[in-house]
């Protein structure tokens, strides 16, 4: 679902000051995911390193997947443009990528009306 991120700090993209960016994690394709991973490694200076942390704990990947969600809606923007974003906006974009990885937007709530039955186990044999 397409949403709009309002930036606290406007960023210059193609000579235009931008303070709103559309994004949609459903538009992250396999090639865009791979480009996000490659851009992350390049930014970190580890382009040739094969070992990476688990995706759930890779906060830099979360940021670049947030960038990918923006690029999915705005193909004229690239990772280099988005790397100029700074401050709190960086954390907001990282949260977009984190939610994509963790699927937190799709979590269902627990129905407290369900009956949970707990049967204690015997600690000693009879």
What are the roles of these predicted feature ranges?
Residues 2-126:
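Short, surface-exposed, charged amphipathic helix/loop patches that serve as local interaction elements
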